[in-house]
Amino acid sequence: GRVLSIDSTFNHQLWFAASAASAGEENKEVNNRINRFIKKLSDNWNTAQNGRIIHSLLTGKKRKLREGVKRIIKPRYKKEIVLKEIGYQTFNLYAFAMLIDAGFQFSDDVYRRLKKSVNYMQSKEFKKLIYLTKYSFSYNPPGWEIPYIISVFKPEATNESHYWINQQLKHSYDSKDKSMSLNTADLHTHNARIYECVRWPDSYFKIEMDKISIPTN
């Protein structure tokens, strides 16, 4: 293989850190690298004013300037990237929740941004626009991701989880095949994304499953 430049897609870096956090509990070097990544978030990660997580890893002044200019002079690019960011909002927050669950701590500034991002996830705007992006229900399933995010950041907001689980099932569940195979081009991967439910607290998972309604075709 070849050593390439830094991957500038933020969720790739974030999920690499979150996955390492799950696997490297006793590894001092791994934990040091994760903490270094978290420390750099203040400079290299940002959100829009409303809390939407920016998709690009904003490393260096030139990269930040180039990304900002593209969003201004290319309206179509801005619209497409905003919808992509909305589709990845819960996928990113899920990884942040994994890091918090693993005991890693964030600066006050970064944690404020995280809370703002969670609030945006609960906003009317997010609930409207997420249906317009191909990166949501058919790709990054909010119905599996939001319950875990809620359990970490806002465990009292159980009704929010009920809503998203139902929306995911309505969009994706095929009662004939008993699988998450509707409205997706990659049914095997989409079915496999059920793994994201394993981080729900056991008691919470049971309560949720008792209250959801499974659609019939």
Protein language model regions, located:
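Glycan-recognition and catalytic cores of secretory/periplasmic carbohydrate-active enzymes
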Residues: 1-217
